[in-house]
From Swiss-Prot:
This is Non-specific lipid transfer protein GPI-anchored 31. SUPFAM superfamilies: Bifunctional inhibitor/lipid-transfer protein/seed storage 2S albumin (SSF47699). CDD domains: AAI_LTSS. It comes from the Eukaryota. Pfam families: LTP_2. It comes from Arabidopsis thaliana.
Length: 182
């Protein structure tokens, strides 16, 4: 239980950072070359539906199956735009979250949902990672990776600076709301 409570205690802060950086990465997507097509919806709000998945996909997590509203949140994300799952994985390193790639890639199967392969996300994953493993099947060891966000192009015109300021203010408001209700 101590592991679950430590994830619960960090969830509000994680969500705020995730919202901030996801908004910036989605708004700045036109400046980057990506393998996966750009999502057609605002992923930052959709990803919040997957907050309970953090304990399952985080490196060092001991949760054997998705908890709480993880699967229903994942279903919501996949129904709206499956590319938002890629956005969540891509932004994980910039949020300070190290993913267990093996478990993250089995999340849809663990929730009995169909999702595009993690390979379609255009992520730099070690070749030894086994995204096709069935839930409950472990590789030689837990594989982890922090995905690096792409470097901004040299032609960045700074157009994402205004949305970043708005996102920062929105994040601060959410931060206060989360901690004042706790």
């Amino acid at each position: 239980m101590a592991t679950h409570s430590s994830f619960t205690a960090t969830t509000p802060l994680f969500l705020i950072v995730l919202l901030s950086l996801s908004s910036v990465s989605v708004l700045g997507a036109s400046h980057h070359h990506a393998t996966a097509p750009a999502p057609s919806v605002d992923c930052s709000t959709l990803i919040l539906n997957m907050a309970d998945c953090l304990s399952f996909v985080s490196s060092g997590g001991t949760v054997a199956k998705p908890e709480g509203t993880c699967c229903s949140g994942l279903k919501t994300v996949l129904k709206a735009d499956s590319q938002c799952l890629c956005e969540a994985f891509k932004s994980s390193a910039s949020l300070g979250v190290t993913l267990n790639i093996t478990k993250a890639s089995t999340l849809p199967a663990a929730c009995k949902l169909h999702a595009p392969s993690i390979a379609t996300c255009g992520l730099s994953v070690a070749p030894s990672t086994a995204p096709g493993l069935a839930p409950g099947v472990a590789a030689a060891g837990p594989e982890t990776a922090g995905f690096l966000a792409p470097n901004p192009s040299s032609g960045n015109d700074g157009s994402s600076l205004i949305p970043t300021s708005f996102t920062t203010v929105l994040s601060a408001v959410l931060f206060v709301l989360f901690f004042s209700s706790a």
